[in-house]
């Protein structure tokens, strides 16, 4: 027995979306310091956020986000290594999805966010050498916490992994 719900969202292809690294480098001075520091270790994964520019504006938006991701360099490793790499990459942009309905941008220098817990389930074999679409949504935030869930699809539209995360989200005095 097998079924899949939901279907893969209809978003622009990864080739039509700007690389996050290119976007960050062009907007470096607008990014909060912790995120500037994080740029040094985000380079192993090519991440392309659909509608990235809106992530840096403080307008209220729906709590959904879509990113394409894959390894920057070819991985010849075993499946477990690909799964570990995807687990690592699945934290990118995840919790910030909970900020969107509140009009808080990741560029807000008083913002502090941290993961409380993060779970992942693999449904099918994955390859970090191929583009995967990560569809994220936040069903709840409150009490300085945000909850986010995600589905990861291969380019054939198969659901290959699911994620869930709760995190701390608060603004502090500078």
Where are these regions (language model features)?
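Terminal targeting signals and extreme-terminal segments of soluble enzymes
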Residues: 1-174
């Amino acid at each position: 027995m097998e079924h899949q719900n939901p279907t893969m969202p209809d978003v622009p292809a990864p080739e039509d979306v700007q690389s996050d690294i290119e976007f960050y480098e062009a907007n470096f001075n607008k990014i909060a310091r912790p995120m500037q520091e994080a740029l040094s270790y985000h380079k192993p994964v090519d991440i392309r956020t659909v509608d990235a520019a809106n992530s840096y504006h403080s307008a209220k938006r729906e709590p959904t986000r879509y990113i394409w991701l894959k390894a920057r360099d070819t991985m010849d490793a075993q499946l477990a290594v690909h799964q570990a790499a995807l687990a690592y990459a699945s934290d990118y942009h995840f919790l910030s999805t909970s900020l969107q309905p509140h009009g808080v941008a990741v560029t807000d220098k008083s913002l502090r966010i941290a993961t409380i817990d993060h779970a992942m389930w693999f449904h099918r074999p994955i390859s970090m050498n191929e583009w995967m679409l990560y569809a994220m949504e936040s069903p709840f935030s409150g009490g300085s916490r945000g909850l986010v869930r995600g589905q990861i699809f291969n380019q054939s539209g198969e659901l290959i992994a699911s994620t869930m995360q709760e995190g701390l989200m608060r603004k502090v005095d500078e």
